Regions:
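A charged, aromatic-enriched C-terminal amphipathic alpha-helix characteristic of glycosyltransferases
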Residues: 195, 210-226
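A conserved mid-protein helix/loop that constitutes part of the nucleotide-sugar donor-binding site
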Residues: 70-93, 108-114
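Short hydrophobic beta-strand element within catalytic cores of glycosyltransferases
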Residues: 169-172, 182
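Aromatic "clamp/platform" in nucleotide-sugar-dependent glycosyltransferases that forms part
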Residues: 152
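Conserved acidic donor-binding segment of nucleotide-sugar-dependent glycosyltransferases
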Residues: 184-185, 189-195, 203-209
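Membrane-proximal helix-turn-helix segments that form the acceptor-binding/catalytic region
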Residues: 1-15
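Carbohydrate-associated surface elements
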Residues: 21, 41
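Short alpha-helical donor nucleotide-sugar binding micro-motif in glycosyltransferases
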Residues: 131-132, 139-144
Length: 226
């Protein structure tokens, strides 16, 4: 891969990377041309509209979740490299205070994750939605107060941008692809260990309605760079 990239760089004027993480990787290959970062675009309106239409209430009713519950939502492929097991392990502590984790999507690792939920006795505060249609994706983000991810395998992570566009702040494991995405305390947080993760959840719980609204607005504004 490195050799092919270097050869390609010799015949082009510029390489385009979707994130700063990939730019650094390419520059580590010692390519001969400049590397510019241009994020893959998304249709912001699709996710903004779901917020305006108040899908939060509708999806929560559909999933049997209280409107007052603190909900963490993950949207994406259920695959081992997404490190979803970490979210389940952390949910053992987060769930003690009534926090609900909603895992949206399907994938080859789903049976293992369901088995993990049984082993950890988390059935009361972890919900699997299974596969949903593309039209429903933006609606399911709205079920959450915070979008969570433990993945460190992303090149850009379009779900981060989608969540932000819907006004959902992020709580994600620290990763290079998030350097230009998350501003701690503004549109979400990055975490390094379980204690950080749980602390941020408690911080959100302790916020007033106005403070939460400001972070949600900043999340939506920050998505415009995509």
């Amino acid at each position: 891969m490195q050799l092919m990239t270097k050869k390609l760089a010799n015949v082009v004027e510029t390489l385009i990377a979707p994130s700063d993480k990939i730019r650094k990787i390419l520059e580590g290959y010692q390519v001969s041309c400049p590397v510019e970062v241009i994020p893959s675009g998304i249709h912001l309106e699709k996710y903004q509209l779901c917020k305006k239409e108040d899908w939060r209430k509708k999806i929560r009713m559909q999933l049997g979740i209280s409107q007052d519950a603190l909900v963490l939502v993950y949207v994406g492929r259920m695959a081992k490299e997404k490190n979803i097991e970490e979210l389940l392990e952390y949910q053992q502590d987060a769930g003690k205070s009534g926090v609900i984790l909603v895992l949206v999507g399907d994938g080859p690792y789903l049976p293992e994750l369901k088995k993990k939920v049984e082993e950890l006795k988390l059935a009361k505060n972890v919900i699997f939605t299974g596969m949903i249609t593309p039209e429903e994706v933006g609606r399911y983000y709205q079920a959450g107060d915070l979008f969570v991810s433990a993945s460190i395998s992303e090149t850009q992570g379009m779900t981060y941008a989608e969540a932000l566009a819907g006004g959902i702040p992020l709580l994600c494991r620290r990763d290079g692809c998030l350097e230009q995405v998350v501003t701690d305390g503004e549109n979400g947080w990055q975490y390094d260990k379980k204690e950080d993760y749980l602390m941020r959840i408690q911080e959100w719980k302790g916020m007033g309605e106005n403070a939460r609204g400001r972070m949600q607005n900043k999340a939506a504004i920050s998505a415009e760079k995509f």
